[in-house]
């Protein structure tokens, strides 16, 4: 977040990050990697150059988008203009053969539905607070909806959890694809 407020800092960070990612991707040639970005980072030239320079490794990289905040300098664009911009960038990344994943928590349903043709995977991270606040039946209905949507649109749907608790076990019992955080 700090880097996004200073273009110079962000530029330096992305150059450093690119070198590190290139080094790791070359060394670990048989591994698949996940790079987490916010959608707002797609507004920056440095992000696009970073991803363009990784095109040779794109089939081994998942770009996982989290959040949907808009940088202050782009707030004058309408929701539709923002959506069109992001769809264009996501299509470009898909054309470059990156695997595109989008977190659905903390963003609008409309945005996720609009981005669906550009995605390979939708992901829901179940936080401890959400588990405690949610009625298990409501949670299962929520999961069922997104699982149905993903199946209908030929996407992978992943529920990311921190540990094996009762709710996690009930999801596994339903055959939902559960991924443990940092796994």
Model-based region annotation:
Residues 18-22, 45-51, 79-88, 107-111, ...:
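Leucine-rich repeat
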Residues 14, 145-148:
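PAS-family sensory domains
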Residues 1-53:
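Bacterial c-di-GMP phosphodiesterase EAL domain
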């Amino acid at each position: 977040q700090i880097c996004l407020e200073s273009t110079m800092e962000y530029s330096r960070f992305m150059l450093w990050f690119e070198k590190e990612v290139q080094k790791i991707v070359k060394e670990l040639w048989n591994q698949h990697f996940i790079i987490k970005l916010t959608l707002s980072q797609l507004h920056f030239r440095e992000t696009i150059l970073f991803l363009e320079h990784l095109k040779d490794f794109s089939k081994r990289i998942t770009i996982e988008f989290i959040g949907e905040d808009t940088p202050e300098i782009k707030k004058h664009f309408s929701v539709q203009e923002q959506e069109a911009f992001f769809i264009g960038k996501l299509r470009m990344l898909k054309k470059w053969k990156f695997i595109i994943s989008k977190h659905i928590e903390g963003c609008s349903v409309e945005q996720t539905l609009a981005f669906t043709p550009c995605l390979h995977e939708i992901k829901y991270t179940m936080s401890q607070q959400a588990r405690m606040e949610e009625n298990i039946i409501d949670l299962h209905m929520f999961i069922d909806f997104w699982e149905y949507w993903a199946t209908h649109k030929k996407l992978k749907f992943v529920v990311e959890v921190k540990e094996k608790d009762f709710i996690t076990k009930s999801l596994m019992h339903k055959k939902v694809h559960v991924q443990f955080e940092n796994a």
